Every structure is written in structure tokens, then in C-alpha cells.
Amino acid sequence: MLKIYLLLSAVITLLLDIPFEIFKQTYSWWLVPVLLIGAFVALVLLHCIVLLVSVLVVNLDKPPKDTDFFRLLVKTFLKMALPILRVKVHTTGLEKIPEDEPFLIVSNHTHNLDPAIIYYAVPDARIAFIAKKEVRDLYPFVYKALHKLNGLPIDRENNREAAKVIINATKLIKEKTNSVAVFPEGYVSKTGELLPIRSGSLKIATKAKAKIVVCTTWGTKQVPKNLFRRRTDIYFDVLDVIDTAENQQTVELGEKIGEIMLESLITKEGYPTKTQEESIDFQ
């Protein structure tokens, strides 16, 4: 989309030359770049306005309408916003992600920016996020955007409601509507340390007979501290893909996923240094 905006900026500049003969003017050496930049900025602002309006008109009482156009708006916005925030996302293992089937993607959770990073890093997957219901009150704009992307709010303390979310998420995968992303720790880790894995969310994959894409996200906690002052390096690593057809026991899956995540996280700069193997129970 950004390349299209650059091309359109050039086209607009060329069209302006027809009535005003800009290229024949002595001051064209500085006016042409100004027009190119101005046209590009105008298109970017228009993009943001369209995205803003698209989210504001979302009716939370109606089923979401997950469209390719809206997903393109969001993905392009993230491509523009992250560099402005001086965020550099480093990715590894993306080639492991299944291309022809929906899946359950699981990651550790250290900051509220984690969903945006996952969405940015895995642009080709139609991901629906499971998010805590408190997002509706804390970040209403984000909540509306997640709703439009088939997101599922979950009450972590209400087992009956959580079971409904698992059923709906399973349906999204079974019907090949969306892949689903969940943070199986259940909460944002305030210290960055990996919290015990709640295996209940893994029923989404076992019931849908879907693969589990195990990932880690590291560095998002530093974004607010570094904002505009220095670059923040964020690392999104796809570690493994687990076929649930070979393992239907969610407790065992949770233990395995926790071990895989921990093995990666302890190599990251800034990860808590105490002996994690002795302090974390993944059951």
C-alpha cells in the first residue's frame, strides 16, 4: 500500500504539471520534491482518517464484518506507525507458519503492544485475537478494531464465558474463517518473566485439530520508555509448530509450550536472570 501511495504521489505531481507547467519553472528543483512529499503525506492522512472512521462506526452489538479492505488498512497503518515510533521488528522462523490452513498462534505476553507486533509480523494470516474483556473500557478504540477483526473478548475469571470463547474460536478455525491468537499465560507479565501456561486455551487447537504455532515476543515493554528518544528493537520469533493430531492432552501441550518459550526467552537481553526452570510450573 505504501508503494501505491508513493506511485500515486508521483502521478499527482505529474498531473499538476499539466496546467501549471511546474517542470518548466526555475524553482522546480525544490517545488517538485515538496509536491511529492505533500501528496504522500496527504494520502497517508487520508488513510488514517478512513481507518479512524471505519473503527468508529463499528457496532459492537452486531456480528463483525471481517473484510480484506479493513485488514489492509490496519496492516498499512502499522507499517507506517511503527517506524515513526522508532520501533524495529526483527523476525525469525516465519517460514514455519502453515500457509494453507488456519492455526492457533500462542505467545508470551509482556505488554499491550504484543498483539500489534504479532499482526505486523504475520501479515498474511487472517488472525483473530482473544483479548481480555477489560480492553473494552481501557482501550475502546482498540476494542472496536479487534471486534471488526473477529476478535473474541474473554472474561478470565468466568469459566462458563471462557468456555464459550473457546467454542467460538474453535469454530473460526474449523470453518477456515480465521487463525486465532491467544496469550496462554492469561495475563501481562509485569516483570517480563514467563508466567505459568494456562492449558485451557489450547483446547481451541485440539478441538479444531489445528496446529499450534509457538512464538515469543520480546522488547515491547521498552517502547514507552524509548518513545521517540531511541530505537526499540522488538524480537518476534516463531519457535515451533506443534501438530495436535499427535498430542491431544492440553496439560502436556502446555508444559511443552512453556518449555519451548522459556528456552528462547532466557537468551534475550534483559530477561530476568533467576533460575526460571526452578521457579515456573507450567501445569
Protein language model features and the residues they cover:
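Membrane-anchoring hydrophobic helices of lipid-metabolizing enzymes
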Residues: M1-F20, K24-P102
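Catalytic core of membrane glycerolipid acyltransferases/transacylases, capturing the structured
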Residues: V55-V74, P83, P98-N158
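Generic preference for hydrophobic
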Residues: T91, I105, F129-I130, F236-V238
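Non-catalytic C-terminal accessory region of glycerolipid acyltransferases
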Residues: L6-S9, A163-Q283
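Short acidic-hydrophobic, aromatic-tinged amphipathic segments that line or gate anion-handling sites
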Residues: T91, L152-D155, T244
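A generic local structural motif
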Residues: T76-F77, V89-G93, P115-A116, I166-A169, ...
